[in-house]
Every structure is written in structure tokens, then in C-alpha cells.
């Protein structure tokens, strides 16, 4: 039995589990910040045209994608997906970030470290995403520990997998995203003895490099605009309670 209590009272432990996203948005970081342990779900199928190899940044015309080109086969798991070595994605991303965030107040504080991360010899998408997530959490000041699902035994069916991961690490609560209805058998999960909570995320507003405000961008946007105040801005807009489903423990 693994125990990862991080200041939760009464021996409660909240775990959240999610696929590794590239330059994830604020809702992703909010969910990690609320948890005592974050498990990266890199063992499930890669989904093309979602958020595992792309995200959005602010531009003068609205927003644009930053996409990591990949080589993958249908049914391939995220941790098996390789980055296309012939594409110049690093240069394109860095050029876009430096151009569109040239007037961001904290550009010089964070972009050099992000550039150094980009310039490492990446071949595997999951490894890149995990490094980017770790960098973002450190830059924000989010201290939630991270483990990978591949470290633990778990069944393949989606709800069974979540139950197994929660039980293995000793979780008493599982924090799911708002889309839990689409992938979870809630009654069966609640019967496992782990309390189910649903994230309620309210997107913060803040001064961006361009007007009007554009929500749902990569978390790099808030970081470059507000710097050390980014985490408090994220937390200030947070509902005081989570939505609990059921009363099982």
C-alpha cells in the first residue's frame, strides 16, 4: 500500500488522474493543485486532434495552435507515441511564443527556461509532456507529487483502471474532471469505497497581452502575464467546495 498524504486531515487522500497533455490549460493545473497526488495516465490510447500533442496560445488575432507532430498508429498508447524527427516544431513554437509574448511582463523570467526545455533531444511524446507539466507546476509553485500509471498494476476497463490506481496508492477520494459522465461508471466506482468528487472550475480573468480576454489557453499564458502571482490568481477564482458524488469512503 502506497501512502502519499500531503497535509490532508483525518487521513484523507485525494488523487486525480489524467492523460499527459502538452502545455496544458488552467483547468488541468487547477485539478492537480487540489489533489494530494497526481497520476499521469500515459497507458491509455492516444487520441489524435485532442490535447495530448497540442495546445493554444494568445495572438493578436485571437489564438493559435502549438502542435507537436507525431508518428503514431491507431490504437497506440500515449507512452508509445514518438515525435516526428523531421519536423521543425521546436523552432516554430519558440518563434511564436517570443513574438506573441514579446510584451508579456514575465517573458524574460520564464521563456529562457522553457527554451532550454524545448531544446532537449525529445523523441517520445509522453516524456516531453511530463517534462513540460513538471516545469509548469514548478513555475506556478504547485507541489503536488506526480507518479505515472505505468508504475502500478491496473485493469484495462476505464472505471476498473481508476479504482485499481486509487486503491493501490491508498486514495480515499478521487477528483474527476467535469467530463466524468463520459468515461466512468459512477455507481460502480462509488461502491469501491473511494469517494468521487467532480471538479468545478471557474476560469480566472486577467490582463493578457492582447484584448479582449481569451479563455481556455495554455497555462503558459497566465504565467507569462502574472508571473509569481499566477497561482494565487488561479486559486482566488476557485469555488470553496468540490462537488461530491455519493457518500462512500
Regions found by a protein language model. Give the residues of each.
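Residues lining hydrophobic/aromatic ligand-binding pockets adjacent to catalytic sites
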Residues: 2-249
Amino acid at each position: 500500500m502506497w501512502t502519499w498524504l500531503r497535509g490532508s486531515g483525518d487521513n484523507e487522500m485525494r488523487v486525480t488522474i489524467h492523460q499527459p497533455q502538452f502545455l496544458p490549460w488552467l483547468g488541468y493545473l487547477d485539478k492537480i493543485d487540489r489533489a494530494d497526488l497526481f497520476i499521469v495516465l500515459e497507458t491509455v490510447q492516444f487520441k489524435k486532434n485532442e490535447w495530448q500533442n497540442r495546445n493554444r496560445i494568445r495572438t493578436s488575432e485571437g489564438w493559435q495552435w502549438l502542435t507537436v507532430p507525431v508518428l503514431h498508429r491507431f490504437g497506440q498508447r500515449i507512452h508509445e507515441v514518438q515525435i516526428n524527427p523531421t519536423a521543425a516544431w521546436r523552432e516554430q513554437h519558440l518563434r511564436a511564443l517570443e513574438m506573441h509574448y514579446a510584451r508579456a511582463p514575465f517573458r524574460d523570467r520564464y521563456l529562457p527556461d522553457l527554451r532550454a526545455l524545448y531544446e532537449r533531444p525529445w523523441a517520445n511524446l509522453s516524456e516531453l509532456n511530463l517534462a513540460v507539466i513538471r516545469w509548469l507546476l514548478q513555475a506556478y509553485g504547485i507541489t503536488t507529487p506526480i507518479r505515472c500509471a505505468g508504475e502500478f498494476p491496473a485493469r484495462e476497463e476505464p472505471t476498473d483502471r481508476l479504482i485499481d490506481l486509487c486503491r493501490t496508492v491508498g486514495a480515499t477520494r478521487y477528483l474527476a474532471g467535469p467530463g466524468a459522465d463520459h468515461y466512468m461508471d459512477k455507481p460502480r466506482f462509488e461502491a469501491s469505497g473511494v469517494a468521487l468528487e467532480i471538479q468545478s472550475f471557474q476560469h480566472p480573468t486577467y490582463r493578457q497581452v492582447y484584448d479582449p480576454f481569451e479563455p481556455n489557453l495554455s497555462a503558459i499564458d497566465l504565467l507569462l502575464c502574472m508571473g509569481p502571482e499566477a497561482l494565487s490568481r488561479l486559486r482566488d477564482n476557485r469555488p470553496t467546495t468540490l462537488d461530491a458524488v455519493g457518500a462512500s469512503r
